[in-house]
């Protein structure tokens, strides 16, 4: 069987559907199949440690009976005996499951589906291990630097992903998409024997858009710039967020907080803020699933509902939440196409598509030049408390700003602020933007935030 052939899955789905239709206790059913072709090279200490090609495929079945009782089962075997087993097991699990009066319906076919472009690249599909070894040479070349890395690791992956959806309401959707990812992690040792780490990565839907030389250079530059770190005095400083920091400190927390499941369960700091001002009027954030060639571009979500562009934050006002069919049904509204599944064995969740933050009018370098003393915040590995919005974390990569210039790297500096306060303290947004994975984001200046140092 060709695991990327829609006709093969249509045949399997129709076979299962005929079996399910015989059982009157089954009111709804959904079949979700996923196929993956992956080619990966992992390297450590500058040498290839592991390399593999693999293909995998599987199918998940959800059956829902009276009063929302649901059974879920799955298989990676498409034989007749395996199909009979998942139908049998799904019915058994449905019978013994808890009633769910909040379930209203599975997704229904949308009136219109937008065609999307450039989500599949045959160059990625045809990559071999030898091709990849050549592509990642710029990372290995870092060992030739005057100050060579003390350690060097990372990986390169190419993925082709097929999804096939079929349900009892008439949903019949499929797609095939591709992406590549490369990352580089290294450390350098300063003259006092203290390490400084650097990292960079890039993920793209098309091989031609991948710039491994830039990834290698950025990881080395970060580590080199971090040598001979300094401590800063505790206090309030103006903060200039890099696009990387904006993506992970501002945009990503919002995308998680507008998940309607979290909202309905009172597990989001934005639960009470719909149609209310949550940030500066200069701040707008959109979700656009139809941008050609981007990582999260898709015509439909993982339930088969049509996707559409939405404005999450409009001039500082919280405008919309993300919904799947279940959470939308609880509120008596239509889903806006944000159902997600990480795997054919996983439950239906909610996630974002492509996130677009608005641009400003000033160059980021002009914004920097206007800061007498402040902090350039590039990256933290910490996450906020999504219930309260409080954030207190280590600035893993950050620098002191002095007289409008980025100078020394920071050591053991912590940033503390509530995210709602951070949104309201947005003072300036740059006119330049960069893609960080699926987010298109600018530089952002916050008027102030508390920085805790060791001095």
Where are these regions (language model features)?
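Dual-mode signal for accessory low-complexity, basic/Gly-rich regions
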Residues: 273-455
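Active-site bordering "gate/hinge" segments
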Residues: 1-298, 302-305, 314-317, 405, ...
């Amino acid at each position: 069987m060709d695991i990327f052939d829609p006709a093969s899955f249509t045949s399997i789905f129709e076979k299962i559907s005929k079996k399910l239709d015989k059982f009157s206790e089954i009111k709804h059913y959904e079949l979700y199949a996923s196929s993956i072709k992956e080619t990966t090279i992992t390297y450590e200490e500058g040498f290839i440690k592991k390399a593999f090609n693999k293909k995998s495929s599987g199918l998940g079945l959800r059956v829902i009976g009276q009063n929302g009782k649901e059974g879920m089962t799955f298989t990676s075997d498409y034989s007749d005996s395996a199909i009979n087993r998942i139908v049998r097991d799904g019915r058994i699990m449905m019978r013994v499951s808890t009633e769910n009066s909040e379930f209203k319906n599975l997704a229904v076919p949308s009136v219109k589906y937008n065609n999307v472009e450039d989500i599949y690249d045959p160059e990625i599909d045809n990559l071999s291990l030898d091709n990849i070894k050549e592509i990642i040479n710029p990372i290995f070349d870092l060992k030739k630097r005057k100050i060579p890395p003390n350690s060097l690791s990372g990986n390169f992956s190419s993925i082709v992903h097929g999804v096939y959806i079929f349900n009892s309401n008439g949903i019949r959707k499929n797609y095939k998409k591709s992406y590549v990812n490369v990352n580089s992690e290294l450390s350098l040792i300063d003259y006092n024997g203290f390490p400084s780490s650097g990292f960079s990565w890039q993920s793209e839907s098309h091989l031609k858009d991948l710039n491994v030389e830039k990834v290698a250079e950025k990881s080395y530059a970060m580590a080199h710039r971090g040598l001979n770190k300094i401590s800063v005095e505790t206090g309030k400083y103006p903060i200039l967020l890099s696009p990387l920091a904006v993506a992970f400190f501002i945009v990503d927390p919002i995308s998680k907080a507008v998940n309607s499941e979290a909202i309905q369960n009172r597990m989001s700091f934005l639960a009470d803020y719909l149609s209310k001002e949550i940030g500066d009027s200069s701040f707008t954030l959109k979700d656009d699933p139809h941008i050609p060639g981007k990582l999260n571009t898709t015509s439909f979500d993982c339930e088969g509902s049509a996707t559409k562009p939405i404005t999450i934050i409009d001039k500082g006002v919280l405008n919309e939440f993300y919904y799947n069919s279940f959470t939308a049904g609880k509120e008596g509204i239509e889903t806006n196409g944000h159902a997600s599944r990480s795997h054919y064995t996983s439950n239906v969740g909610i996630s974002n598509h492509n996130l677009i933050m608005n641009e400003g009018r000033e160059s980021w370098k002009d914004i920097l030049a206007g800061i007498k003393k402040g902090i350039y915040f590039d990256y933290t590995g910490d996450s906020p408390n999504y219930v309260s919005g409080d954030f207190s974390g280590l600035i893993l990569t950050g620098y002191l700003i002095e007289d409008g210039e980025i100078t020394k790297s920071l050591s053991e500096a912590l940033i503390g602020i509530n995210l709602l306060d951070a949104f309201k303290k947005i003072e300036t947004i740059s006119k330049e933007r960069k893609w960080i994975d699926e987010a298109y984001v600018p530089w952002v200046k916050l008027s102030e935030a508390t920085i805790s140092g060791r001095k």
